[in-house]
């Protein structure tokens, strides 16, 4: 009969960012424990607050099934001597397995016959195994940072205060550090800090709410959402949507309630992004806006308790925010005393990266790269691109960005407008940081896009030049994000800029800094971009269609993306399977291709002439379709070759004895394969 497992780890406040991952890791760890022990189980539930992590598993088997275990020993040739007597190797293996040598069996494997010890193992009770599993699970939760406390030889995110562990309502006995497991949990630290008994998950959830704890983060999130909307309505405003903040705050509290506070309207002269950043990043406050989206002088904060006098909480939060905003106002006013262009010189004293020089040197490189892009793609904005690139990093040495790094670029735009720069240049200063996250907003203007592309490419190529290449677990310079940003901007804008030329232009500007051969760096950078492009496209289209196109060429990202989309649509045809098989057959026969011209005089079968004629006609139509970037039409034309290809393979022996005839037939198939290759490598497609 299946039973339920319940585990709660109660501790001091865990950082909000640790909790969701710990919940996911607990699920993975218990699955690993049960799977390794051959214990069947059902639904797994994980919950978490700043003070507790909860794991509940339903339908856990009472015991392991009995098992027959086979341990492989030495090969037969080493296990017996010429007279058939067991050798020391066989005797030692039997002794190690705890059985007599006569009980060993011969097992036939792919490598030959081997000795094996086959033993029956009686399954153990789950209740007997859990005291070993659960402390191991607790100790294996991989927190980003963990700590020891007192003199105990265990680690956890924060010191543990209690552990409740139950299987079928009975305590699972074990110790972790100085804590013995039991059947009691505890309520809210400030509102009901008393122990209460736990029987199972359902009973636990009921008791928690009675003791002012909401263990389910999704329920807490919805409570917070409803609370901030209620309070915003009372304040005659609207909550500025911020799902990331909502997610974070839901892991900061156990029993949320919302209160409304205000700040002086005088602070509204400071750019709204600064005010929002100060409230969100530093205080975890939700901002309020009016019906037109204008920022209101108010905020909503989430409290972890229900207070008798909310105004006490409000006043405290208002006082803290007032100090923050006063600092912001001071920096804003002081920064206005120095023109943005005057700050550019200060970048010479800011080290961008030890091997790549200062921020000023970086600016000079990507300014030239941005001008090159503008010259090739929109020459009318060259001067604006040059100006925006010159100024776009200057706000890094301003007081405001020094205090609030999150508003870099935004303040550059504000200061540029204040100094009388063109609005297009000012906007490009802010846009050049875009996108700031996957799927985020992209630069709206060509000016901002060119500066953004140039800056990001210089970052990627610069790091690769000096060996700072991302690994599977580390990407300290966010090069993957920069590469995806470049790809998304190019695709969104439709820029037909060969990626290889763009990379080479960037590397030429970095030649003096490079510690690796530039040709090697270029190959690595292009491989890096190919990986990002393939991953991005594979989220939208079948992976084999993506690989089929990207393996041929992805230098023109816009063209490659369009070909992938066309190929993905083309493969939905009912006759795609047979088409793919025919195309693959051609490609497999002429893997390297034959460069000799096709001679009709060497044809010995009518099928050869028919295929040659069909290829000639289709090649022209495909070329026209490719010029128009109508890749679906090109694929449709190529598909018309199938009858002629099928007839050719039915009637003609490609590998003829006559060398000239054989080469002529291979040349004919090479023409077809190269026509396919103008779009994709069909050998990579699944029928």
From Swiss-Prot:
PROSITE patterns xref list: AA_TRNA_LIGASE_II_GLYAB (PS50861)
Compartment(s) where it occurs, according to its Swiss-Prot or TrEMBL record: Cytoplasm
Primary localisation category: cytoplasm
GO BP, sorted A to Z: arginyl-tRNA aminoacylation; glycyl-tRNA aminoacylation
SUPFAM superfamilies membership: HD-domain/PDEase-like
Keywords: Aminoacyl-tRNA synthetase, ATP-binding, Cytoplasm, Ligase, Nucleotide-binding, Protein biosynthesis
Top-level enzyme category: ligase
GO cellular component: cytosol
Catalysis: reaction(s): tRNA(Gly) + glycine + ATP = glycyl-tRNA(Gly) + AMP + diphosphate
UniProt-listed Enzyme Commission number(s): 6.1.1.14
GO function terms (MF aspect): arginine-tRNA ligase activity; ATP binding; glycine-tRNA ligase activity
Entry similarity comment: Belongs to the class-II aminoacyl-tRNA synthetase family.
Subunit structure, interactors included: Tetramer of two alpha and two beta subunits.
HAMAP family per UniProt: Gly_tRNA_synth_beta
Protein name: Glycine--tRNA ligase beta subunit
Native species: Geobacter sp. (strain M21)
């Amino acid at each position: 009969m299946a039973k339920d497992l319940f585990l709660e780890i109660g501790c001091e406040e865990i950082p909000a960012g640790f909790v969701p991952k710990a919940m996911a890791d607990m699920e993975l760890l218990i699955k690993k424990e049960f799977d390794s022990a051959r214990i069947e189980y059902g639904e797994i539930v994980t919950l978490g607050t700043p003070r507790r992590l909860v794991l509940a598993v339903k339908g856990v088997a009472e015991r392991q099934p009995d098992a027959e275990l086979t341990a492989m020993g030495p090969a037969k040739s080493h296990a017996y001597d010429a007279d058939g007597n067991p050798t020391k190797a066989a005797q030692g293996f039997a002794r190690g397995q705890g059985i007599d040598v006569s009980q060993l069996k011969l097992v036939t494997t792919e490598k030959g016959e081997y000795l094996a010890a086959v033993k029956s193992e009686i399954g153990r009770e789950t209740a007997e195994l859990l005291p070993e599993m659960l402390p191991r699970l607790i100790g294996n939760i991989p927190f980003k940072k963990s700590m020891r406390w007192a003199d105990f030889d265990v680690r956890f995110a924060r010191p543990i205060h209690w552990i409740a562990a139950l299987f079928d309502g009975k305590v699972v006995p074990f110790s972790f550090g100085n804590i013995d497991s039991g059947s009691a949990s505890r309520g809210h630290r400030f509102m009901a800090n008393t122990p209460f008994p736990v029987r199972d998950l359902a009973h636990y959830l009921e008791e928690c709410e009675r003791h002012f704890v909401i263990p389910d983060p999704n329920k807490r999130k919805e409570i917070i959402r409803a609370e901030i909307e209620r309070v915003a309505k009372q304040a005659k405003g609207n909550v500025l949507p911020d799902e990331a903040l909502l997610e974070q705050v839901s892991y900061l509290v156990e029993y949320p309630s919302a209160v409304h506070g205000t700040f002086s309207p005088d602070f509204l002269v400071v750019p709204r992004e600064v005010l929002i950043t100060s409230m969100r990043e530093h205080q975890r406050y939700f901002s309020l806006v009016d019906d037109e989206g204008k920022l209101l002088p108010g905020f909503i904060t989430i409290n972890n308790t229900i207070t008798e006098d909310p105004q006490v909480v409000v006043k405290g939060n208002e006082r803290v925010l007032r100090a923050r905003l006063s600092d912001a106002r001071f920096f804003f006013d002081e920064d206005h005393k120095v023109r943005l262009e005057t700050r550019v010189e200060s970048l010479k004293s800011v080290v961008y990266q030890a091997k790549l020089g200062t921020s000023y040197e970086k600016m000079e490189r990507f300014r030239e790269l941005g001008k090159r892009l503008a010259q090739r793609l929109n020459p009318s904005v060259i001067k604006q691109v040059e100006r925006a690139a010159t100024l776009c990093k200057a706000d890094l040495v301003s007081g405001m960005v020094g205090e609030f790094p999150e508003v870099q670029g935004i303040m550059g735009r504000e200061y540029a407008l204040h100094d009388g720069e063109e609005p297009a240049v000012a906007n490009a200063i802010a846009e050049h940081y875009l996108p700031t996250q996957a799927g985020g907003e992209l630069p709206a203007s060509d000016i901002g896009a060119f500066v953004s592309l140039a800056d990001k490419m210089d970052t990627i190529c610069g790091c690769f030049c000096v060996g700072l290449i991302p690994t599977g677990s580390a990407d300290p310079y966010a090069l993957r994000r920069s590469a995806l940003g470049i790809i998304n901007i190019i695709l969104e804008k439709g820029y037909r800029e060969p990626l290889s030329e763009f990379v080479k232009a960037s590397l030429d500007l970095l030649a003096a800094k490079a510690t690796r051969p530039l040709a090697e760096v270029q190959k690595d950078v292009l491989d890096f971009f190919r990986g990002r492009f393939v991953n991005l496209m594979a989220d939208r289209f079948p992976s084999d269609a993506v690989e089929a196109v990207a393996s041929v060429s992805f230098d023109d990202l816009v063209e490659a993306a369009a070909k992938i989309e066309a190929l993905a649509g083309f493969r939905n045809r009912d006759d795609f399977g047979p088409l793919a098989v025919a195309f693959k057959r051609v490609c497999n026969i002429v893997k390297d291709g034959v460069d000799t011209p096709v001679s009709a005089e060497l044809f010995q079968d009518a099928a050869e002439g028919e295929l040659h004629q069909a290829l000639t006609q289709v090649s022209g139509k495909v070329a026209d379709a490719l010029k128009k970037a109508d890749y679906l039409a090109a694929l449709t034309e190529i598909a018309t070759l199938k009858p002629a290809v099928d007839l050719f393979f039915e009637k003609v022996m490609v590998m003829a004895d006559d060398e000239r005839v054989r080469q002529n037939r291979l040349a004919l198939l090479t023409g077809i394969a190269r026509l396919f290759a103008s779009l994709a490598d069909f050998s990579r497609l699944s029928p």
